[in-house]
C-alpha cells in the first residue's frame, strides 16, 4: 500500500506514512489476501483497463524500447494477447488445483465480485469496461471493507476462459492487417495518437 491508487492514475489522499505499506480494512486491521487472490486481481483488472480500441492500455510503459510512452492513447495488442494466455493458464491451474486438493471454493475480498462480471455486451464496450474498473478501484481506493466472498473454482474458471476466448477472438477480428494474397500481420500496439503502428 502506498500513495498510488486506481492503477497508478490517482493518489490516495487519505494515505500517509503512519498508515504503513500494508493494505488495511475499514476497521484498521491489516488485510491478508492470498497469492491466488492477488493473481486474479492483477489479471482481471488488466482485462478491464482498455483504451478506445479495447486493447490493454500502456500507461506510459516503454513496452517496445522505442520510447513512445503513449500515456493517453497507448494500447498494447501484444500485452492483450499475453493476458489472454494468462487467463487460460490460471483457469487450467484452478482445474488442476481442484482435482489435486479438492478445493472447490476460493475466498476473496468482497470488492472483487464486480471483476467477475461477464457477457459479450460488457466485453465489447471499452466505456463499460473502464467504468467497471473505476467502480472497483473506487471501492478499495483507501481501505477494503474486510468482508469476504466464496466463489466456486468452476465459476471462476468459466469466467476466465470466457474472457480469454473473447480477447483472442477480438484480436483475430480487429487487429489483423492484411497485405493481400493471404498475407499480413497482427498490429502490435497503438501509439499516443491512437494509430496502429506496428
Where are the language model's segments positioned?
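Acidic, mature catalytic/reactive cores of soluble proteins
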Residues: 1-198
Amino acid at each position: 500500500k502506498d500513495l498510488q491508487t486506481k492503477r497508478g492514475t490517482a493518489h490516495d489522499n487519505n494515505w500517509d506514512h503512519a498508515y504503513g505499506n500494508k493494505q488495511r480494512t475499514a476497521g484498521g486491521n491489516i488485510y491478508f489476501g492470498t497469492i491466488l487472490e492477488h493473481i486474479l486481481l492483477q489479471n482481471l483488472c488488466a482485462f478491464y483497463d482498455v483504451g478506445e480500441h479495447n486493447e490493454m492500455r500502456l500507461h506510459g510503459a516503454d513496452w517496445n524500447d522505442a520510447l513512445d510512452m503513449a500515456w493517453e492513447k497507448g494500447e498494447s495488442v501484444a500485452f492483450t494477447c499475453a493476458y489472454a494466455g494468462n487467463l487460460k493458464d490460471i483457469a487450467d491451474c484452478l482445474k488442476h488445483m481442484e482435482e489435486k486438493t479438492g478445493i472447490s471454493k476460493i475466498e476473496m475480498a468482497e470488492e472483487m465480485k464486480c471483476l467477475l462480471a461477464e457477457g459479450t455486451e460488457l466485453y465489447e464496450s471499452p466505456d463499460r469496461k473502464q467504468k467497471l474498473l473505476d467502480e472497483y478501484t473506487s471501492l478499495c481506493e483507501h481501505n477494503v471493507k474486510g468482508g469476504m466472498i466464496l466463489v466456486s473454482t468452476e465459476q471462476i474458471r468459466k469466467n476466465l476462459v470466457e474472457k480469454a476466448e473473447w480477447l483472442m477472438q477480438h484480436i483475430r477480428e480487429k487487429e489483423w492487417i492484411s497485405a493481400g494474397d493471404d498475407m499480413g500481420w497482427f498490429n502490435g500496439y497503438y501509439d499516443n495518437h491512437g494509430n496502429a503502428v506496428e
